[in-house]
Regions:
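Compositionally biased, low-structure terminal segments
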Residues: 3, 45, 102, 131-132, ...
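Short, hydrophobic beta-strand elements of compact beta-sandwich sensory domains
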Residues: 132-156
């Protein structure tokens, strides 16, 4: 009788310990996942701000800089000068990227009142917003220049 009780208590203890370990592991994974997601969001915002700040200070946009920034920050950029897409991007962008860029532009205009297709909407200060789409982090910006406006969409 004691042997049977001993076996039952052993299995019961193992079950309780297993449940406690499972709950603790799940909680730790949840916390780690949220931290990783928040870290990725903060990194994206910092990288996007760096790119926007660089474009604010430059009068000439180098294709080498664009390619290097996209590679270093693991982002895709759509930069338009007074509504005209840069020639470099016309050669590289595939239809999927173009669809995502246009969707980001629509969300920016509809939900955040930052219309990239209306370059006259910005005065003397750069306007930028950050938001999330289903699979992407997005930043859109309108940057005033002496010759007009540079609009920018960054996807991560």
């Amino acid at each position: 009788m004691f042997r049977r009780l001993h076996i039952q208590m052993t299995f019961f203890s193992a079950l309780i310990i297993g449940i406690v370990i499972f709950i603790m592991t799940t909680a730790c994974n949840f916390i780690a996942e949220n931290s990783t997601r928040q870290n990725a969001w903060n990194t994206f915002q910092n990288n996007a701000i760096s790119c926007i700040s660089h474009l604010e200070t430059q009068s000439i946009i180098s294709s080498d800089w664009i390619l290097q920034a996209e590679k270093n920050y693991d982002i895709s950029m759509d930069i338009r000068d007074n509504g005209n897409s840069l020639y470099l991007k016309k050669l590289q962008t595939d239809s999927l990227d173009e669809t995502i860029f246009r969707k980001a532009e629509e969300i920016s205009a509809a939900s955040y009142a930052l219309d990239l297709s209306n370059p006259g909407a910005v005065s003397k200060l750069t306007k930028r917003i950050f938001f999330q789409m289903k699979d992407f982090y997005v930043s859109t910006a309108l940057i005033p220049k002496s010759h007009g406006t540079v609009s920018m969409i960054i996807l991560y």
